[in-house]
């Protein structure tokens, strides 16, 4: 279970991105984060995995407060957090199988990770995961030969290879067509239910969020202004969340809120 208690983020400029955000995500529940540009959705995800240090509050993953741990313990805890990225974050020249196995880098000795010699158990599990996401036949294909939807499936398998206690998903369908977007969202929902995983999904597509999320949390100016079932998301609630912004065409968070090296930083920390 993930629990956020009065999580706050204020930057050195004085700008407050998150204002005492409190919410709990039980095991097996998939929560969608919605809101206008600059609402704090990406900042919230970056605070949870500590790519950004929160200014206050607690981040409880099980009985561990991620906001309070030191660097060494944080590296260990990041193994428990699976990340699925909009940009896929695959190593293009490596095979699909090698990319999935990279999710195990934080669990093997340095010499094994350097030579990419993984235990048999990890390899067998990677094959099972590729079968689950529908890519078993592509195990030996290079990542750069895959379609966008296939690359995202590899990203899902890699995150699951970590055997995480939490999934953080950052706009997984922003680069995909509508049909593939539905397939990816359905897959994320299914694997979380199968593994009893809590998940938070930053999603800009409101109708897609209403269709697939167990629960929706609406952010506006860094505050939670809605927390409830998708069926409760009516025009009045949407106006509260989005204000004057057209929610039907709401785009991604602005560039300043997501640093370009975030993906590499997370994967590097997991692999240490």
Curated annotation (Swiss-Prot):
Catalytic activity of the protein: phosphonate(out) + ATP + H2O = phosphonate(in) + ADP + phosphate + H(+)
Localization per Swiss-Prot or TrEMBL: Cell inner membrane
PROSITE patterns xrefs: ABC_TRANSPORTER_1 (PS00211), ABC_TRANSPORTER_2 (PS50893), PHNC (PS51249)
Keywords (A to Z) from UniProt: ATP-binding, Cell inner membrane, Cell membrane, Membrane, Nucleotide-binding, Phosphonate transport, Translocase, Transport
Residues that bind ATP: 35-42
Keyword Nucleotide-binding: yes
Main localization (coarse): membrane
Pfam families: ABC_tran (PF00005)
Family annotation (CDD domains): ABC_PhnC_transporter
Membrane topology note: Peripheral membrane protein
Biased composition (Basic and acidic residues): 254-272
UniProt GO MF annotations: ABC-type phosphonate transporter activity; ATP binding; ATP hydrolysis activity
Domain ABC transporter: 2-246
One CC-aspect GO term: plasma membrane
Region of interest (Disordered), ranges: 248-272
Oligomer status and interactors: The complex is composed of two ATP-binding proteins (PhnC), two transmembrane proteins (PhnE) and a solute-binding protein (PhnD).
Function: Part of the ABC transporter complex PhnCDE involved in phosphonates import. Responsible for energy coupling to the transport system.
Protein name: Phosphonates import ATP-binding protein PhnC
Organism, scientific name: Chromohalobacter salexigens (strain ATCC BAA-138 / DSM 3043 / CIP 106854 / NCIMB 13768 / 1H11)
Taxonomic path: Bacteria, Pseudomonadati, Pseudomonadota, Gammaproteobacteria, Oceanospirillales
